[in-house]
């Protein structure tokens, strides 16, 4: 599990989920500190290891936060 406590005011949690020999990741993003906005997603990567899936998912989550901020 990877946790980013404060990325542009968001709390990000990422953990790997294995499926048929490949690893995807589950991402939970919530706005800090209120936590009133929560985004939950399973991101299909098909990575060979859990670590790689988590690292890729953290990058994906940070881009999601940045894109969400830009669209405001």
What are these model-derived regions, one by one?
Residues 20, 37, 55-56:
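Residue-identity detector for glutamine
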Residues 2-6, 38, 60, 64-72:
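Intrinsically disordered, low-complexity regions
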Residues 37-52:
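A short, exposed loop/beta-hairpin motif centered on an aromatic-Gly-Thr core
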Residues 1-33:
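N-terminal segment of the canonical double-stranded RNA-binding domain
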Residues 48-66:
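A short, charged, amphipathic alpha-helix used as a generic interaction element across diverse proteins
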């Amino acid at each position: 599990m990877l946790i980013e406590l404060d990325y542009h005011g968001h709390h990000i949690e990422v953990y790997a989920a294995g499926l048929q020999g490949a690893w995807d990741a589950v991402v939970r993003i919530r706005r800090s500190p209120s936590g009133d906005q929560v985004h939950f997603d399973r991101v299909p990567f098909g990575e060979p290891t859990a670590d790689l899936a988590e690292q890729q998912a953290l990058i994906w989550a940070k881009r999601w936060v940045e894109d969400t901020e830009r669209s405001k």
